Amino acid sequence: MAKQEYKQLPKRAEVHSATEQFKDTIKTSLGLDLFKGLGLTIKEFFSPSVTIHYPMEQLPLSPRYRAVHNLQRLLDSGSERCIGCGLCEKICTSNCIRIITHKGEDNRKKIDSYTINLGRCIYCGLCAEVCPELAIVMGNRFENASTQRSQYGSKSEFLTSEQDAKNCSHAEFLGFGAVSPNYNERMQATPLDYVQEPSKEESKEETPTNPESNKGDENV
């Protein structure tokens, strides 16, 4: 292993006289670094404000935002979309979904109870991805603070009202590939945006010509 060599930096010259102290003070206080810091401060002072005064102001949420779940209904009849298959309960990684069903007179499953323990839910969205009927989707209601645990997870809290379903007033789930609102304004430039493609004239000038191939073409 090579031996490392350390060099001692020269010491700063000591200032003794009052004139030299005054010159050193002016040099350090009125140097270029001070003006750089002041320029940055003034620039940010007059720049537009980006602060959101929550809760009076709120940012638009993306359609892919994962918050408290919504149980959807059919738009025409207003009936519940959930068929009680239990796929959401089986795929739930935090084991927070509980479905109790029974067979009705038509041998179809009827839902007795559908609960989601929001205290254990990690909002991964797997239940919404696996649902074959789009009955459970991820909503955008994130203000769900409460002092009692019993207020979380009841079916009536998640289920869309029948009147909203018949009036088609509730929004359908746009899917996990939906774009966010104002995505053009929020899109930032990448390094590839600053690369300029060569024009056609420049590309023609840069293409090398092989004289031997031209001679062969003339002989033919």
Swiss-Prot record:
Binding sites annotated in the UniProt record for [4Fe-4S] cluster 1: C82, C85, C88, C131
EC number of the protein: 7.1.1.-
Protein origin, superkingdom: Bacteria
Names of required cofactors: [4Fe-4S] cluster
Binding site for [4Fe-4S] cluster 2: C92, C121, C124, C127
Region (Disordered): 187-220
Gene3D superfamilies membership: 3.30.70.3270
InterPro entries: 4Fe4S_Fe-S-bd (IPR017896), 4Fe4S_Fe_S_CS (IPR017900), NADH_quinone_OxRdtase_chainI (IPR010226)
Keyword entries, A-Z: 4Fe-4S, Cell inner membrane, Cell membrane, Iron, Iron-sulfur, Membrane, Metal-binding, NAD, Quinone, Repeat, Translocase, Ubiquinone
A GO-annotated cellular component: plasma membrane
Subunit structure: NDH-1 is composed of 14 different subunits. Subunits NuoA, H, J, K, L, M, N constitute the membrane sector of the complex.
Name the UniProt record assigns to this protein: NADH-quinone oxidoreductase subunit I
Organism this protein belongs to: Helicobacter pylori (strain Shi470)
Gene symbol of the encoding locus: nuoI
